Amino acid sequence: MASSNLIKQLQERGLVAQVTDEDALAERLAQGPVALYCGFDPTADSLHLGHLVPLLCLKRFQQAGHKPVALVGGATGLIGDPSFKAAERKLNTEETVQEWVAKIRKQVAPFLDFDCGENSAIAANNYDWFGSMNVLTFLRDIGKHFSVNQMINKEAVKQRLNRDDQGISFTEFSYNLLQGYDFACLNKLHGVALQIGGSDQWGNITSGIDLTRRLHQNQVFGLTVPLITKADGTKFGKTEGGAVWLDPKKTSPYKFYQFWINTADADVYRFLKFFTFMDIEEINALEEEDKNSGKAPRAQYVLAEQVTRLVHGEEGLVAAKRITECLFSGSLSALSEADFEQLAQDGVPMVEMEKGADLMQALVDAELQPSRGQARKTIASNAVTINGEKQSDPEYIFNDEDRLFGRYTLLRRGKKNYCLICWK
């Protein structure tokens, strides 16, 4: 992405929700490398899909020659951002937040290049400047620059202020000052001139721009990326099991890959623009090809492949594709023990059973059939496989050969109903 028309290119991808003084920012970016930052608060022990668009945006700026600063909020994570939240967040302990800071820092690192000369990325933690600040300094040096009148008129907190049942604590109300000071601080420390974030962060970003101007007399900018929505109106980045996480221990690479494979046709080309580094021309050509092929679209496979590789690397992608292929074909011989661990984690429904169980009981325990009677009929009708092999004997009792790697047996009823038995 050439720097001179970077904003235009981001707009073509649908990646710009709001931007302050667009012409001045475009001019500033055209003059040479700019330091920019995005903040990630440790509200859990992993980032999730909602964080991916701003994180990839940092990467897009770095690829265009700019210097990204990834800020993990060791201090702001202790307070909690009230922006567009219906209720007060639960406060986490300092130990928990510090632990999460370390994990999120590690997660962010592979997306950016920390060793590429002039525009090498920087990792920052706002606990470094807030941890030792006393309350008088905070109120005198930061608080006096903020107008409460303006703060209560910010859209992000308006809904909370108007609700009798919830309201907002002084703790969360002060969050805006903390994030505002982050921008001013990073401007002084690293010359940061641009903050990016999700569109829910607009109020916090504009506060930071204002504070930086007041404290350092510098012009700085803000740009937000849209919060991702799906064409059908349902929430993006959620499955029945909850959020889709970037940590493979919380969402396996197989489940992650499947999430993208299941993208609706109405969303997939937009998501290719948001979540991949493919050229717009390439994405448009793929859309055209899918429209005219008369076959199932290829776009979902391209999207799943690109994003899984970005987040889980080549190894994670290869494993996810291998598991997908084996489940589709019914032949499990290529699956490794680690693949079965992914399936047990969240890939297919899982049930633990004692050795000596029979097939009918397994189908009932696995919720593949409601009763032993129904299970008997299903087995007799040749609709059940054990590890890919058909089994039509209703009295069948599992043996050691059925226990792959000593503990896994994959049951299938019909074409698509799976359950993994983990033997105790």
Swiss-Prot record:
One Pfam family matching this protein: SYY_C-terminal
Motif position, 'KMSKS' region: 235-239
Gene Ontology molecular function terms on file: ATP binding; RNA binding; tyrosine-tRNA ligase activity
Positions that bind L-tyrosine: 37, 175, 179
A single BP term in Gene Ontology: tyrosyl-tRNA aminoacylation
GO CC field: cytosol
UniProt superkingdom: Bacteria
Motif 'HIGH' region, residue range(s) on this chain: 42-51
Keywords of the record: Aminoacyl-tRNA synthetase, ATP-binding, Cytoplasm, Ligase, Nucleotide-binding, Protein biosynthesis, RNA-binding
Substrates-to-products reaction catalysed: tRNA(Tyr) + L-tyrosine + ATP = L-tyrosyl-tRNA(Tyr) + AMP + diphosphate + H(+)
EC numbers on record: 6.1.1.1
Annotated ATP binding sites: 238
Sequence ranges assigned to domain S4 RNA-binding in this UniProt record: 357-414
CDD domains xref list: S4, TyrRS_core
SUPFAM superfamilies noted in UniProt: Alpha-L RNA-binding motif, Nucleotidylyl transferase
Bilayer-spanning residue ranges: none
Residues in the signal sequence: none
Alphabetical list of HAMAP family matching this protein: Tyr_tRNA_synth_type1
Protein task: Catalyzes the attachment of tyrosine to tRNA(Tyr) in a two-step reaction: tyrosine is first activated by ATP to form Tyr-AMP and then transferred to the acceptor end of tRNA(Tyr).
Family: Belongs to the class-I aminoacyl-tRNA synthetase family. TyrS type 1 subfamily.
PANTHER family from the UniProt entry: TYROSINE--TRNA LIGASE, MITOCHONDRIAL, TYROSYL-TRNA SYNTHETASE
NCBIfam families registered for this protein in UniProt: tyrS (TIGR00234)
Assembly and interaction partners: Homodimer.
Protein name as annotated: Tyrosine--tRNA ligase
